[in-house]
């Protein structure tokens, strides 16, 4: 298992350590940023608009796939409002034929290749996905 303190993240990285691990793992799995996926993709106005949100990863390869890294504390222990936002984001994307897969940060720290590969195969092992 990797701990956040063991990961060297570039100073200009704007996301979380688990998001960086996922980013690097998707690259190791043969996906190219800017071509196969976009990192931090705002939809429906992003966080600045009511009902908008930001996807951690929006993929073109494979098509119609989005992946969000879920911080266990914020997304599960912070209350029902955070969970409701995640469920609404998933439903909104489903209406656009995009599958939103969640990867829990604690799972990502244990085995990034497994969980990222599973996400690329549209398999959700997160607490929200029933995993």
Predicted regions and their residues:
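Nucleic-acid endo/exonuclease domains
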Residues: 1-131
């Amino acid at each position: 298992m990797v701990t956040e303190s063991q990961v060297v993240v570039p100073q200009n990285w704007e996301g979380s350590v688990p998001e960086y691990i996922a980013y690097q793992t998707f690259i190791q799995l043969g996906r190219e940023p800017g071509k196969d996926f976009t990192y931090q993709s705002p939809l429906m106005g992003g966080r600045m608009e009511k009902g908008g949100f930001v996807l951690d990863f929006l993929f073109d390869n494979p098509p119609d796939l989005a992946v969000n890294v879920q911080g266990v504390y914020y997304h599960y222990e912070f209350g029902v409002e955070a969970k409701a936002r995640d469920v609404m984001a998933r439903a909104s994307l489903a209406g656009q034929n995009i599958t939103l897969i969640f990867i829990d940060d604690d799972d990502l720290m244990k085995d990034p290749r497994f969980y990222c590969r599973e996400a690329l195969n549209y398999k959700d092992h997160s607490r929200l996905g029933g995993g």
